[in-house]
Amino acid sequence: MHLESQAFAEADAGLVGMMGMRGRGMGGMMGGRSNVPNGTPLRVMTLRTRARQGAAFRVPERLSSFDAAWAPRAGAPIRRVPLTFQRMEWLLDGRTFAMGDVAPEETVAAGSTQLWEFENLANPMGMEAAHPIHIHGRQFRVIDRTGGRARNALRAGIVDAGWRDTVLVLPGETVRVQVPFTRHPGLYLYHCHILEHEDMGMMRNFRVT
């Protein structure tokens, strides 16, 4: 836990700055401010229980399994996914989100395995931002990290160990992940998990056929 916390603390250029604005987000760049003062209580929703439900269940003896002998698959196809900022939009592979839109390279065959290479590129505005990239419906393994400013805990592979569904890509970094598309055909999302970035377009569909 300490090492993972250290890794995120070391990523201040990206996570603390969010959009490279040192915590001010797009409001810091635009000069805007929230009209809700910090600490103000907000009613988000009200939940009402209409009937008492039984709570009888058993926890499985084994929740999951882990293959300690796992190794990257040689010869897996590589898909490059640049992470960029243009025209006030965050982009995945040069595209923003469109409902139901799937590019040819975003269509994969069930049972296949691919390497997805996320490259966090500089942009003309000079903004640096970390992107925690989340892939729906799949778990993957981080193969390697190159470029960027070294973060000790990340470089040591501690945070990246094991099966993941989200990977942090720091400014200037290229991170390769191996994704097995083993089952469950359908339409899925992959996106940046920073809400500002996602809402500004950094989300796409992929289809497993």
Q: Language-model segments: which ranges?
A:
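Extracytoplasmic beta-sandwich strand-turn segments characteristic of Greek-key/jelly-roll folds
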Residues: 103-107, 131, 137-185
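Extended terminal and domain-junction accessory segments
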Residues: 1-131, 137-140, 180-187, 191-209
